[in-house]
Amino acid sequence: GILLVFDEIQSGIGRTGKMFAAEHAGVEPDILLTAKGLASGMPLGAIIAKESIMHWGTGSHGSTFGGNPVCCAAALATLDVVERELVSNAAAMGERLLAGVRDLAKRHEAIGDVRGLGLMIGVEFVKDRKTREPHPQAVRDLVNAAFAKGLLLLGCGKSTLRLAPPLIIDAQDIDTGLQLIDECLTARK
């Protein structure tokens, strides 16, 4: 058969409102990759796989940074907090953020699509909703206008805005961010 591999470097460790995005699909990958959120910024990544796949001969795999005890301790502490508090917060705040961005899309024609899970949301900008022609300048303008108001945003791809706030975000910060985005988009019209 074919191996199912999930790259959860960005989407794992609670980001999507579940510990791993694979859980949303109801599947169990053969191999799962995780890093970034795993150790709260400490340099650590992991390959999680079924035993039959990970059975390698001695010396066939090595790592320059593998097994660093400080990074491993950071990962254990991170996982404890994420599992206890932040997965549920990411799910709840992600629903709030997604609903808010979808509301913005009703009022701003430049938003062509909104998609995401938990606190990992993409907002696609278009010149025209019928042709769906990408609008990279709209993303650049929004990122710059938001920065001037104290809101840090990041574009990705050709014409998509990536929204991936911290897992500790609260409703007030979500609402403030949405208000600032709305102000920037309204001023651009």
Ranges and model annotations:
Residues 1-189:
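Conserved N-terminal phosphate-binding loop of PLP-dependent enzymes in the Aspartate aminotransferase
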